[in-house]
C-alpha cells in the first residue's frame, strides 16, 4: 500500500440494493470488508451512504404510501436508524467504530457551520473512527436539502481534505452515450475537466430507488476536482473496486484533480449549495469570465430566491447557464432594487451601501 490517504466512498441506493427493493446485505458486507482492509492499512475512510428510505420501506413491509415529502421523511426516519445499525454492526466485526453525521444544506451554506462540520469530521478521522454521512432526510425540506448524495459526497470530501472521492454506482462509469440503449457507447476512462459537451451526454439513473443520476455525479466530480480531489465513478459490483482505486488501478472513469486547486475559502464557495440565483447581461458575463472582474449591480437583470448578505449565490448568463458562484454583498431584496443601476446610485436607492460591487471577484468562482 502507498502512504496513508483519505478516501470518501459514496454508495448510492442502487449499489446498496442491487436494483431490488431491499438492502443487499451480502454485498454491503463485501464493501465493508474492502473498507476495513484499507482502514487496517492506515488509510482514512469516509462513507456517504444512501438507502435510508429503502431501508425504512423494507422494515415497514413495503407500505402503500402517498407520493409525498412527508411519506419519504417517514420512511427516512424509520430507515435511518436501521441503516446506521447495519453499518455499525458490520464495521464492528473488524473492531472499527463509526460515527454518524447527518447534514443539511444549512451546514454548508453558513461558513461557521461548515467549519464546525469540518472539525467534527476530521476529529473522527484523527481518532480512527469511520464517519458515516447522510443527508438528514427525516427533517430536510426542499429548501434545506443539498439535493442528492453525490453532491453531498463532494462536500464531504472537501470537509475531510480527501485525496480521492469514489462514486459507486450501477454503471461502469461515464460513457460516450447511454450504454443501456446504445451498444456503440464507449467508456470514458479519463476526464481532465467537466465541460458542456460532457454534461450533454450524462444520462439519469433508472433504478427508481434513488434521486442521483450521472448528471449529479458530474457536478460532484467538478466540485471535487477543482478542490484538488481525484474523483472516480465506478461500478459498485466490481470485485475489489475500492482497493483498486486506492492502489491507483484504472477502473471506471477517473476525473483528474485540478493542478492548481482552489484555496480553502473558495472551496467552500464553490461547494456550498447556492441560496439563490441572479441572471446577468452579456457585458457582465464577459467582464467576469474574460477579465476576472467583480459583478456590478448594473449588469444584473433579475434576482431569484430569498437570501441574505454573505450567502453563496449562483450567477447565470442570459441563456440560463451557470457561469459562477459567489458570496453576495447584498441581500436579495436589496439586489432587486439596485439591479440595472450604476454603483454610484446604491446609497441613494438603499440608504446605505456595502461597497460598489454585488459580488466581489475575490469571493467568486467562475465555472
UniProtKB/Swiss-Prot annotation:
Keywords: Amino-acid biosynthesis, ATP-binding, Cytoplasm, Kinase, Nucleotide-binding, Proline biosynthesis, Transferase
Residues noted as binding substrate in the record, renumbered to the chain: 50, 137, 149
Pathway named in the protein's UniProt entry: Amino-acid biosynthesis; L-proline biosynthesis; L-glutamate 5-semialdehyde from L-glutamate: step 1/2
Catalyzed reactions per annotation: L-glutamate + ATP = L-glutamyl 5-phosphate + ADP
EC number(s) reported in the record: 2.7.2.11
Any GO MF annotation of the entry: ATP binding
This protein's GO CC annotations: cytosol
Enzyme class, UniProt record, top EC level: transferase
The organism's place on the tree of life at top rank: Bacteria
Span of domain PUA: 275-353
Entry's localization field: Cytoplasm
InterPro entries (alphabetical): AceGlu_kinase-like_sf, Asp/Glu/Uridylate_kinase, G5K_ProB, Glu/AcGlu_kinase, Glu_5kinase, Glu_5kinase/COase_Synthase, Glutamate_5-kinase_CS, PUA
GO annotation (BP), single: L-proline biosynthetic process
Positions with a binding annotation for ATP: 10, 169-170
Keyword Amino-acid biosynthesis recorded: yes
Similarity section: Belongs to the glutamate 5-kinase family.
Cited function: Catalyzes the transfer of a phosphate group to glutamate to form L-glutamate 5-phosphate.
NCBIfam families, alphabetized: proB
Protein name stated in the entry: Glutamate 5-kinase
Source organism per UniProt: Salmonella paratyphi B (strain ATCC BAA-1250 / SPB7)
Protein's gene: proB
